């Protein structure tokens, strides 16, 4: 499966904010954004003129990096969102939030989306009693998420639960039993991603 292998701390520095790509490290003073709050590269400390197109492009790139989605897949999400009823930008975020790997992070069952992707790909999680090993799987209301019996990742997952303070209202989690339920799809106000989705819509509408 193709993925972005560029250094994660540099991805955050390039966007000028924490995207929480490295799990526990992002909550410490070792965070790259905390240590170097300017973009990577020889001219990172300089300021480039921000054209409208550049601002829109940066917002799209930041969103892709936040959700750890490649360009082709991101465009497919946008195309699907644009065909749905409602506001395209909100539809896009709802699709991204409903990815299985993202949901595990929101539930506190993974410290980062990369870790969540590994846990899913290695078959440690089930949905409605069936093993699901596709990180991009779209969860639906009433889905029951549970750890596979006998999973060797239990300790890693329990450690991740210690990093989360609250679980979004559209999800319900039992951190002791390592089970969860999708209550409904998220409202825009419940999506904490640092994204201005209208800029992405404007970019793709050109």
Explain the meaning of each model-derived region.
Residues 124-125, 130, 150:
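Short, surface-exposed secondary-structure boundary micro-motifs
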Residues 1-107, 134-206:
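Ferredoxin-like alpha/beta domains used as RNA- or RNAP-binding modules
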Residues 119-120, 139:
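Short, well-ordered loop/turn sites that connect or cap secondary structure elements
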Residues 109-111, 125, 147:
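Conserved, well-structured core segments that form or line functional sites
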């Amino acid at each position: 499966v193709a993925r972005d292998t560029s250094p994660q701390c540099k991805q955050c520095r390039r966007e000028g904010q924490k995207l929480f790509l490295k799990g526990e490290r992002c909550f410490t003073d070792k965070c790259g954004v905390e240590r170097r709050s300017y973009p990577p590269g020889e001219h990172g400390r300089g300021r480039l003129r921000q054209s409208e197109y550049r601002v829109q492009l940066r917002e799209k790139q930041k969103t892709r990096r936040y959700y750890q989605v490649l360009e082709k897949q991101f465009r497919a999400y946008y195309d699907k969102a644009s065909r749905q009823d409602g506001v395209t930008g909100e539809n896009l975020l709802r699709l991204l939030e409903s990815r299985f790997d993202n949901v595990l992070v929101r539930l506190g069952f993974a410290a980062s989306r990369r870790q969540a992707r590994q846990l899913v790909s290695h078959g440690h999680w089930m949905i409605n009693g069936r093993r699901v090993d596709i990180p991009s799987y779209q969860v639906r209301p009433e889905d029951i998420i549970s750890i596979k019996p006998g999973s060797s990742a239990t300790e890693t997952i329990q450690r991740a639960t210690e990093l989360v303070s609250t679980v979004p209202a559209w999800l319900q989690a039992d951190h002791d039993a390592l089970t969860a339920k999708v209550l409904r799809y998220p409202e825009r106000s419940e999506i904490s991603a640092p994204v201005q989705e209208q800029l992405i819509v404007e970019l793709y509408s050109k």
